[in-house]
Structure formats: structure tokens, C-alpha cells
Amino acid sequence: MAAAALRDPAQVPVAADLLTDHEEGYVTFEDVAVYFSQEEWRLLDDAQRLLYRNVMLENFTLLASLGLASSKTHEITQLESWEEPFMPAWEVVTSAIPRGCWHGAEAEEAPEQIASVGLLSSNIQQHQKQHCGEKPLKRQEGRVPVLRSCKVHLSEKSLQSREVGKALLISSGVLKHQVTHTGEKSHRSSKSREAFHAGKRHYKCSECGKAFGQKYLLVQHQRLHAGKKTYECSECGKLFRDMSNLFIHQIVHTGERPYGCSNCGKSFSRNAHLIEHQRVHTGEKPFTCSECGKAFRHNSTLVQHHKIHTGVRPYECSECGKLFSFNSSLMKHQRIHTGERPYKCSECGKFYSHKSNLIKHWRVHTGERPYKCSDCGKFFTQCSSLMQHQKVHTGEKPFKCNECGRFFRENSTLVRHQRVHTGAKPYECRECGKFFSQSSTLMQHRKVHIGEKPFKCNECGRLFRENSSLVKHQRVHTGAKPYECRECGKFFRHNSSLFKHRRIHTGEMQ
């Protein structure tokens, strides 16, 4: 068959669908073989020749498993020994002429102008109407229809890998498709015929117990257990078990995206990806959790969600041993150990380990405060800040210190307080080695070393390292004296001044 002559694989008919009631016979290797002349063989590159070899051998193996190929042909022997399997040009053309149908306008068209292709077409129904009308395929019990050849004109343009690959893929696919419709050739006894029509599956996988109605399906399935991947991508070297999967994969390299979304125009390389994408527009969520009823667009998302109910946490951090339900959660967690901060604020250049933290930080620049307190109307940038604030109104203080019995609104505040009892000072200054009980105190202290004074008095321009120092200083300008002595009623600007004054009344200064 001259696959080299394909102008467009979509113009080539499906051989199995060209059968008429009176044209059925037994399948032989010749009916599904693909042949090239010496001139055509030279046009194939190494990847195309390898693909050709794999398809021919697979077709022969399939027919042999069905009892339809009793001995190896000369061509198969050539392929196994890696010899060039081309035929003379006249033999390629005339080998299938008696069974063919013609694309030429006249039946007398010269054989030299045509080539046997016997492959399939993506436009099946159109071709059927041209040649066979709309007769349905009628199967005679116990017989396998012959794949008929169809002639098309030779093309002048060079072979393209995609055309040859699709043609060869189709050659193999037609044979498998035909066997699926007709059953195996070995319906020799009434018992086996009855078993086939009854839908029985006699071919059982010894590994997993799965049963199949046809032997070739079992052979294909067993590749899963054997890990056998015989089809290699010439672009990246990736291996596949089935040629159909290789063909689908090659779209990645060609960049072809034939499936377009009618709603937004986005294109996809596979129809399955388009179907999944369209759920964004339709809102369809066909995958429902049997535990909680939550629905998802993708089955993979449902599978991940199930881990919440099962408690399965297969992903373990090698640094601290913490377990996670999802690999993505583990990867985010590991940034704590690596210090990686891939998310950068475009306004101030600050980096964050998680995108969610960057989004929260971004509100500092935009001024957005989407969370409102229903009690006092105050707005907050984060939901967690609102929840903490609401405890002010409820008076809730659920966190208790076991040492002194004091209560706190937040657990973080309790943890900081407990350092008063334990004396823990986990925060060390790298400059001078001084330790602090709180991170905020360390940050304030570090300004001593770097000389940073970010807080400026608007009245006199004086700079301060801490905001609290600025607040105290501003009382000089405002005259505010918020601290009152309960003994004599005198007021003071600073709490420290009041503390010293009280010694007069207690007699400590004497």
C-alpha cells in the first residue's frame, strides 16, 4: 500500500466500512499489509520506517493470535531482520487491483497512476455514501470480512511524518475495529459461536483476573503488567504501549490544537481536555463526593478531596516528618525549611512563600479591607484579623495560662505570655548576641544596629526608631499628660514620671 501517496488522510476511506453483503471473505495478512515501492521507501525517514515496521509486526501478531496467519510471510521475515521490505512499483499497484474501488473518473484509468492504500478516513460516512450507499455492515456468522483496498491518485509532494503515522495507525486500527465487530475467526464450533454471541469472556488475565472476549484484547492488556512499551516518539524518545497513544502524544510536538471552545475560543490538543474545560462555562460538576455531597468538575479533584474523609496522608516531609494529604501541600510546606519565597510584591519588592500571603499583603497597598465587623463596623484586611477582633465584643478569652490562671483571646498571645514564667528568649540578635522573648522586640532592637529611624515627628522633624517613642515625644508638642497621680491629682506626660512621683507619697525617696 502506498501510504506515501496520501494527500490528506481524511480523504482515504475506512476499508471495513466499504464492505457489501456479497463482498465478504476471510481476512489474510495481504488484506491489511502496507507496501512501498523502492522509490517511496527512500522518501521515508528513520522514524517513519520504524513506525511502519512496528505496525506491520503488530498486525501480523494480531492475525496470528486469531489463527489467521499460519506462517510468516517473506515481508515479515524481512522486517524482523531489519531488511528493506519494499516491493517493485508495478507489484505495489497491481497486488490489490482485483478487489479495489476506484477514485478515478473512469474505470480504465491506468494502474501506473494509482496506488493501493486500503486505509481509513476520518470522513467515514461521506465515503460510504459514494461507494456503498448507506447499507449497514452485515456480518455473516463465523466469517471475518475482508478489508477491501481503495485506490487514490499519487501525490507529487514529499511524505510527511504525520500523514504516514496517521495512515499506519489507521491500518492497525481498522483491523482491530473489524475483529471487534465480527468476533474471532475461530468460530469453528457451534459452542464457541454461542459463547461469542452470549458475550462470554474466555480470555482471562492471570495477573489480575480481568476477562476479555477476544484474545488480542488480552494480549494488549497484558502489556500493562509487563510494562512493555514498544512505540517510541522520534521527537523526545518517550515510549508508549499503544500506537494510538503515541499518535495522540505527538500532537504535543506539532503544537496542533484542533479542539476549540465555542464560548471563549481557547484551543486544546485533545477533545477530552476541551470537554473538561467546557464545564467552566456550563458550571457542570458531575463528580460528587459520597461522604459529604460536595461536587467537583474533575474526577482527579474528587479523588484528592476523598483523602479528607479517609484521613490518608501519604506525603511526608523529610525534614520534620509532618504528613500531608496532597503533594502540593507538602511542596508549600517545604518552603519553610528551604526559605524559598517565590512570590514577589511588585510594589515594594517584598517576597512571600505562598501566593495567598502575597494576596493578603497586596491589600496594604490597595487599601482594600473586605472584612467588616458587624458589631462596630470596623474593616479588616484579613478574615483571621476580623475573627480575633470580634472576641473584643464577645469578651471571649478561651486561652488560659496554667501558671497564673490569666486568660487570653488568642493562643499566640498566651504563648508569648508563658515566656514570662519560663524565661524563654528564643529570638537572638545576630549583631550583638542579645536574646529577646518576642520577635517584635528583636525587630525593634535591630534598628539600633542599622541606625534605622522610620518614625518622624511632623512638628519638629525628629526621627525615632519606634512608634511608641514618637507617641511619647509628641506629647511635648500637644501638652498631653495622660498619667494622673491618685494621691494628689497631679498629671504627667510619661508613665515613668508618674512612677517616680509616687515615691514621694510612699516615702521611698527618703
Curated annotation (Swiss-Prot):
A zinc finger (C2H2-type) spans 203-225, 231-253, 259-281, 287-309, 315-337, 343-365, 371-393, 399-421, 427-449, 455-477, 483-505. One of its GO terms (molecular function) is zinc ion binding. GO terms for biological process: regulation of transcription by RNA polymerase II. Residues 27-98 form the KRAB domain. It is found in: Nucleus. InterPro entries: KRAB (IPR001909), KRAB_dom_sf (IPR036051), Znf_C2H2_sf (IPR036236), Znf_C2H2_type (IPR013087). Keywords: DNA-binding, Isopeptide bond, Metal-binding, Nucleus, Repeat, Transcription, Transcription regulation, Ubl conjugation, Zinc, Zinc-finger. There is a cross-link at K166, K176 (Glycyl lysine isopeptide (Lys-Gly) (interchain with G-Cter in SUMO2)). One of its GO terms (cellular component) is nucleus. May be involved in transcriptional regulation. Belongs to the krueppel C2H2-type zinc-finger protein family. This is Zinc finger protein 419. It comes from Homo sapiens (Human).
